[in-house]
Amino acid sequence: TGDLGASPDNINWVLTSYIVAAAIMTPVTGWLADRFGRKELFLTAVVGFTVFSMLCGIAWSLETMVFFRLMQGVFGAAIVPLSQTFLLDINPRERHGQAMAIWGAGIMLGPILGPTLGGWLTENFNWRWVFFINLPVGIVAFLGMAAYLPAVARRVRGFDFFGFAMISLGVGALQLLLDRGGEVDWFSSVEIWIELGLSLTGFWVFIIHTMTAEHPFIDPKIFLDRNFVTGLAFIFVMGVLILASMSLLPPMLSTIFGYPTVTIGVVMGPRGVGTMISMLVVGRLMSKIDARILVVIGFLLTAQSLYTMSSFTPQMDNWLIISSGVIQGLGMGMVFVPLSTVAFATLDVRFRTDATALFSLVRNLGSSIGVSVVTVLMVRNTQINHTELSAFINPFNPNLWAVSPAAASGDPMALSQVDRIVNLQAMMISYVNDFKILMVMTLLAIPFVFLLRKPKQAPAGGAPAAHMD
């Protein structure tokens, strides 16, 4: 933050600007792809994302950094949904599982390995290299896509400005609320109430407009597909589980266990290995095993890992952290690949680009909401736990006399040391309770897996099936 002359509070806008811009632009991906060409939009998105990533690396002030990050979000919003759309389009239905395994590996490994790589670059070089490293990746991606991506016919359709404005208002205000809530003490701030009101208004008007408009921004027929709607609900849950649990571990390992950044990356990295192995295996198993069974097994593995995390103590060794992370990676990979395949298996191909954009948007919203909720619970519960534990620090407690006679007799230095221990214990209890909540959420999701319908066998030539069992 010193390079930009910004305080830690102000630097949060660097993240907020990207998230809000990407959230607003994601829903419009389908219309832009139809209007300007899917391949052309994809190439433009990669170029824009890479260029503004480089500009972030050379930003000379907070204002320029925030603007460059905002533009990076504008261009980056289309990359994930378009990549999924292309892989679904260029592969026959019977190979969708393997295609989604490859795609999912990139989607899942990014959030897992990104912080580790970013921390290493920052410690050994400079924070600017977090952005510079995107240049060679962007160049290779552009050249590969320009050479091999097929051109897709454009489709002319009107643009629903009012619908876009309303969903942008709803999504943008919600993301601002989630990103700013922790800084301004949530609903004790007028700002948060305003953002909540704007978000609810935007979503409500958008829903009414979508149901009544002649040519709405998003065709409501998309939501008639049972698999897709169920898939949206589950990808929201996955968004919560993936980033919520991952957002808890680094501060816990740093604050309570005293791990340096590099060590945190080392103990969390194997989670990505578990995810990669799971996705590659599941991609092949989908042609032999009902995708719903794979999703159930994945949720059970995820719940098992969260149960293990709920037993974490400050005295445990690294292997418990690593093993629980690997199991969670295996579980999430087993959920993500079948879910990303089955959700689109019965959907009309006309809606695929809009649908992948919605899929990406809902996953990101789930991630944002999950991180915000578990963070709030951790902070608030730490305060409550600290108050309850502090009640035992008094001269009438014989256990305190046995552990620290100086603290029991009122020595200020000894009491300060005891208070530090109490605070760490209060935080540990809060982290454990968060993991328990995520575990229960995972288990509650399992019965609803069977709302997904198994699609009929793809017809010859791999054309998408339009009917369900």
Sequence positions of predicted segments:
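Residue-level signature of the transmembrane alpha-helical cores
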Residues: T44-G48, F52, F68, F75, ...
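Hydrophobic transmembrane-helix bundles of small-molecule transporters
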Residues: E123-L241, L248, T255, P260-V262, ...
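Short helix-capping/hinge motifs at transmembrane helix termini and TM-loop junctions
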Residues: W60, P92, Y148-A151, G182-E183, ...
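12-transmembrane solute porter fold
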Residues: P8-L15, Q175-L176, S188-L198, G202-I384
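Hydrophobic core positions of alpha-helical segments in small-molecule transporters
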Residues: V14-S17, T44, F67-F68, V80, ...
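Hydrophobic/aromatic residues within the transmembrane alpha-helices of Major Facilitator Superfamily
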Residues: V20, I24, V51-M54, I58, ...
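Hydrophobic transmembrane architecture of multi-pass small-molecule transporters
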Residues: V140, F359-K454, P459-D469
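Transmembrane-helix bundle of Major Facilitator Superfamily
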Residues: T1-A147, V281-V282, M286-I289, Y307-S310
